[in-house]
Amino acid sequence: MAHKKGASSSRNGRDSAAQRLGVKRFGGQLVSAGEIIIRQRGTKFHPGDLVGRGGDDTLFALAAGSVQFGTKRGRKTVSIVPQQ
């Protein structure tokens, strides 16, 4: 294996694709059951009422309604307020 770079070669050019994390549905927005609300790594947001958490910490709606952000015991939470 050469330890000097040859002509027209480069040591750069490696990068990973973005993970597309973040809030997908914002406060007050209507969602249907199963819709992804937040994609995250770790529990930056915790699930509240009618919100489930996937194996990769994704938060999703368990029922149709509007998204509501709040805090509970110092943690940021996401809940669903059911439609009347």
UniProtKB/Swiss-Prot annotation:
GO biological process, one term: translation
Listed GO CC annotations: cytosolic large ribosomal subunit
Alphabetical keyword list: Ribonucleoprotein, Ribosomal protein
InterPro entries found in the cross-reference section: Ribosomal_bL27, Ribosomal_bL27_CS
Any one GO molecular function term: structural constituent of ribosome
Pfam families for this protein: Ribosomal_L27 (PF01016)
N-terminal signal peptide: none
Keyword Zinc: no
Keyword check for Ribonucleoprotein: yes
Domain of life, per lineage: Bacteria
Protein family: Belongs to the bacterial ribosomal protein bL27 family.
HAMAP family on file: Ribosomal_bL27
Protein known as: Large ribosomal subunit protein bL27
Organism: Salinispora tropica (strain ATCC BAA-916 / DSM 44818 / JCM 13857 / NBRC 105044 / CNB-440)
Gene: rpmA
